[in-house]
């Protein structure tokens, strides 16, 4: 007995002919092993979202083709062992547009936990640290074929210390010390001690567009984000480490705005070779300890715009 030919309901004309921007699947979980020459492979458990647009004259997309496209590309990656995460998403976008001939746009996003090793600042104890890495790709059909733009990113947790509250504590301490010390001694005392403040658990995020002939490593983005807050955080800290982290953070207080500007400055310094039209998104969310709300700051710009602000404007003001 042969296979039964079922009717293709998706190809019917919808009762309400409206174009849909994104239709697809979310939360597709996969196992991905990335081989590295001379080093241990990276094992990821990424989650994929995959979408195409839908013309107004078609009732539905062929939904099974989306997870099928993800699986097909991942199998190919396992065989070749050579593909960056953002390029992986771009390949899935390309496969989606092949499978959905009626679509003019496809979009794939991926996020995964990423483990890396880090040593504590004083005792040098090694521990596994977890962070998030992301990749996106968007493809369009035009008269010349398929145009794809891809991005790589990371999100890292760190620690921030509020400068405003710290200055208030410093001034209150000054007034207290002046009750029994002279001005010069008070200033000497204030200059050699750290002052209390309220802290935040900060989450920094960077997403950078990756031009076709360029490579941006997620590990470098992790470094940039960590170094842009008051202090990194660690899974394992002994007492000397804990003291060092707290002291270091309070010697380096930052607003949420400072963190974003620090990341922007480091991105401009680290990637002078990226084209001016490269899109960059930088975001910081600080989870407050003494408020019920959180603090947020963001910068979305091209590399050319960032370079102008950092180099031209700052140079003119110096």
Curated annotation (Swiss-Prot):
One of its GO terms (molecular function) is GTP cyclohydrolase I activity. Binds 1 Fe(2+) ion per subunit. The keyword Cell inner membrane does not apply. InterPro entries: GTP_cyclohydrolase_FolE2/MptA, GTP_cyclohydrolase_MptA. Pathway: Cofactor biosynthesis; 5,6,7,8-tetrahydromethanopterin biosynthesis. The record marks 162 as: May be catalytically important. Gene3D superfamilies: Urate Oxidase. Its cofactor is Fe(2+). Belongs to the GTP cyclohydrolase IV family. This is GTP cyclohydrolase MptA. It comes from Methanothermobacter thermautotrophicus (strain ATCC 29096 / DSM 1053 / JCM 10044 / NBRC 100330 / Delta H).
């Amino acid at each position: 007995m042969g296979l039964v030919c079922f009717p293709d309901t998706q190809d019917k004309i919808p009762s309400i002919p409206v174009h849909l921007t994104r239709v697809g699947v979310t939360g597709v979980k996969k196992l991905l092993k990335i081989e590295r020459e001379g080093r241990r492979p990276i094992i990821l458990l990424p989650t994929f979202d995959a979408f195409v647009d839908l013309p107004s004259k078609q009732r539905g997309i062929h939904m099974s083709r989306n997870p099928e496209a993800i699986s097909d590309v991942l199998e190919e990656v396992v065989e070749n062992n050579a593909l960056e995460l953002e390029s992986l998403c771009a390949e899935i976008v390309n496969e989606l547009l092949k499978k959905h001939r009626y679509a003019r746009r496809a979009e794939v996003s991926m996020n995964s936990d990423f483990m890396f090793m880090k040593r504590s600042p004083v005792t040098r104890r090694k521990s596994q640290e977890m962070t998030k890495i992301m990749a996106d790709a968007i493809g369009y059909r035009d008269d010349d074929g398929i145009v794809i733009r891809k991005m790589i990113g990371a999100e890292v947790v760190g620690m921030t210390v509020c400068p405003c509250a710290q200055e208030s504590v410093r001034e209150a301490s000054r007034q207290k010390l002046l009750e029994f010390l002279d001005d010069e001694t008070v200033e000497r005392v204030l200059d050699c001690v750290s002052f209390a403040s309220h802290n935040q658990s900060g989450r920094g995020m960077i997403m950078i567009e990756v031009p076709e002939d360029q490579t941006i490593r997620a590990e470098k983005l992790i470094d940039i984000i960590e170094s842009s807050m008051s202090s990194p955080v660690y899974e394992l800290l002994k007492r000397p480490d804990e003291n060092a982290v707290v002291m270091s953070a309070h010697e380096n207080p930052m607003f949420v705005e400072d963190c974003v500007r620090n990341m922007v400055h480091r991105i401009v310094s680290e990637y002078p070779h990226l084209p001016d039209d490269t899109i960059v998104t930088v975001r910081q969310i600080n989870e407050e300890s003494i408020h019920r709300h959180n603090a947020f700051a963001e910068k979305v710009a091209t590399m050319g715009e960032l370079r102008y602000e950092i180099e031209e404007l700052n140079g003119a003001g110096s």
